């Protein structure tokens, strides 16, 4: 089964639909299977005190201006939906509150996503599980008890899901990846397991692919120097193309695990073993 590669646009569009479409183009041209966004209802997710606090940004001088500037509304998501259908690439989004999930459900995307930060928000998990769409569940900032409960909710709802091993640091240091958790999750929950990476570079993602992940999510950016907290942990277009190309090569290289003589080895074997006239 081919690894399902998700290009996480998140909020790296900076509230600009043109940037969003440029990033969708990059994902499609690179061979990704889907793009993902993030959706928040600002007055639910953040406190009034935080929203009123000072923060310089391209949209104003407080946190509210910055948070609202990064959010897309109905018209933008309608255009994203239309554009992705035109290009033939799936899209979906991770909701950070119930209202946002209900908003997203009107677009009837094929997939849902539980962000690591939301894994312990049971009402949201129950709402998403009730939709019975294939759901990617990131496990960053979570312990076994947290993940057990999330899995229980999805199993009770009979909603298809896969876990995504994740370390929620931005960017993540390679030595923090703990990729052996991929096998731990697979063995404990008897489900498909993917990897959601926030590292700089590609080596950790390649290693995850070799460990048998079924999905891979990486943030993408037009330019890592652009404004935004997620840009530094993102892949620019050239790196994304390199990632997807290498992942597809790794998939082919893994093989089926059967120990046999490759047909291409036979003439070489005859030549190199001719002096003792034996070919296995």
What do these predicted ranges mean?
Residues 1-280:
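Catalytic cores and adjacent flexible loops of soluble metabolic enzymes
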